[in-house]
């Protein structure tokens, strides 16, 4: 698994946590987790390189401190999503 495609989990309201640490994911597509209103924890591997627009849009329970990251990319994507 190297990519989570565009809108893969769009409006998946029952999704509470995602752990990709044991994958080689390099890309999270546009709106991949948008409107996942129960998502509270997101763990990404250091292989992550690309984040599409609005990856975490309207993920109201997900806050930057809940994101386990090895670089700042997930936090930047989150901050762009909530604007």
Across the structure, where does each feature detected by a protein language model lie?
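Structural signature of tandem-repeat unit edges
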Residues: 1-3, 13-27, 37-50, 60-83
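Consensus positions within tandem repeat domains that build extended binding/scaffold surfaces
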Residues: 5-10, 29-32, 52-55
